[in-house]
């Protein structure tokens, strides 16, 4: 059985004036989040702003979290990305989903009411347990890090 997450609608325009978040295709991982604004917001180059989504969430299950990610078209075409690059929503958070938007482009960008501004993906969570050790069991890779396997 598929797990369902309770997402509360805080703004009555969501589902009326602004469409409910949906998965675009059966293979979509992310839900589009929309700007729940009264009026358009002009974002100057280099500026950031917090934009409400009109949605609140309480995941409640500590084995799950959600991440907010930029929409690829906004970033590539207009330089519009998330101000914090990725937004993490912990399972015990209960507030409205706000999106930090950063205009890293060269031109002003206008965020229109109801515009799709980010996407949200639910992900499993594994918490680390720390154990003090003196050494690891050796592997073929060892301490090989950045670029250790070459480019081809």
Curated annotation (Swiss-Prot):
* Family the entry assigns: Belongs to the dUTPase family.
The record, for CDD domains, names: trimeric_dUTPase
Key words of the record = Hydrolase, Magnesium, Metal-binding, Nucleotide metabolism
Record's keyword annotation contains Magnesium: yes
Q: What is the lineage of its organism?
A: Bacteria, Pseudomonadati, Pseudomonadota, Gammaproteobacteria, Enterobacterales
Instruction: State what this protein does.
Output: This enzyme is involved in nucleotide metabolism: it produces dUMP, the immediate precursor of thymidine nucleotides and it decreases the intracellular concentration of dUTP so that uracil cannot be incorporated into DNA.
Q: What class of enzyme is it?
A: hydrolase
Name of the protein: Deoxyuridine 5'-triphosphate nucleotidohydrolase
């Amino acid at each position: 059985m598929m797990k369902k997450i309770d997402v509360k609608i805080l703004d009555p325009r969501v589902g009326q004036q602004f469409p409910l978040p949906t998965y675009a295709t059966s293979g979509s991982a992310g839900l589009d989040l929309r700007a729940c604004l009264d009026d358009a917001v002009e974002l100057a180059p280099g500026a950031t702003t917090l934009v409400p989504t009109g949605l609140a969430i309480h995941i409640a299950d500590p084995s799950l979290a959600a991440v907010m990610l930029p929409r690829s078209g906004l970033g590539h075409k207009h330089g519009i990305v998330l101000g914090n690059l990725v937004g993490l929503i912990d399972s015990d958070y209960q507030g409205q989903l706000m999106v930090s938007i950063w205009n890293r482009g060269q031109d002003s960008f206008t965020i229109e009411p109801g515009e799709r501004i980010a996407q949200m993906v639910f992900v499993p969570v594994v918490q680390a347990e720390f154990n003090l050790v003196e050494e690891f069991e050796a592997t073929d890779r060892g301490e090989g890090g950045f670029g250790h396997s070459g480019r081809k």
